[in-house]
Amino acid sequence: MQDTTLHIRHLGKQDYESVWHAMQHYTDTRDSESHDELWIVEHPPVFTQGQAGKSEHILNAGDIPVIQVDRGGQVTYHGPGQLVVYPLLDIKRSKVGVRQLVTHIEQSIVDMLAKYDINAYAKADAPGVYVDERKIASLGLRIRKGCSFHGLALNVDMDLAPFRRINPCGYAGLEMVQCKALGGPQTVIEAGEQLTITFSQLLGYQHLVHHQGLAAS
């Protein structure tokens, strides 16, 4: 039976590796009674290379660290002004398939941006969300023990230049775009609030409980 309560953790600005290891720990130690959680965070500049990642897609990392991680997909960039959301969900319990979860995540971004009259869309052959063929949100998940971790990154109000140091998600020349330039949410906080609403509605959560920071382990 699905847990109809979603716990939202507002982590503020946190370095990538500590949050990644906390996600792994939560997933590895959770059981059938554990809460579904949505972690909302902003990371300092970092490139993360997914399991399918090829080194040739990192063109010139320069002074930005590159971290090899255990999610799907290729290389992407995280930095200040980008909303990062990690859904830690028991999809086996809720009987949601992996492809269905990806579709729900993409659609929650599309629905949120539609509130700002932004015509965004997903693409069947390239995970993420796009506006006029420019990418506004990236997606990369990992499923372990029937539970999801990792998640999505939405460009809100950030320096997009570091994306030119890589082939984003393995696509050479892929142009990125962000919410602020399109009249969407102007801050990471606003984007997080709005995305939480559309995400919880799409996945059928009826109660939201908000927390500041990570739970004590």
Curated annotation (Swiss-Prot):
Pfam families: LplA-B_cat. InterPro entries: aa-tRNA-synth_II/BPL/LPL, BPL_LPL_catalytic, Octanoyltransferase, Octanoyltransferase_CS. GO terms for cellular component: cytoplasm. It is found in: Cytoplasm. GO terms for molecular function: lipoyl(octanoyl) transferase activity. Catalyzes the transfer of endogenously produced octanoic acid from octanoyl-acyl-carrier-protein onto the lipoyl domains of lipoate-dependent enzymes. Lipoyl-ACP can also act as a substrate although octanoyl-ACP is likely to be the physiological substrate. In the reaction, the free carboxyl group of octanoic acid is attached via an amide linkage to the epsilon-amino group of a specific lysine residue of lipoyl domains of lipoate-dependent enzymes. This is Octanoyltransferase. It comes from Shewanella baltica (strain OS155 / ATCC BAA-1091). The gene is lipB.
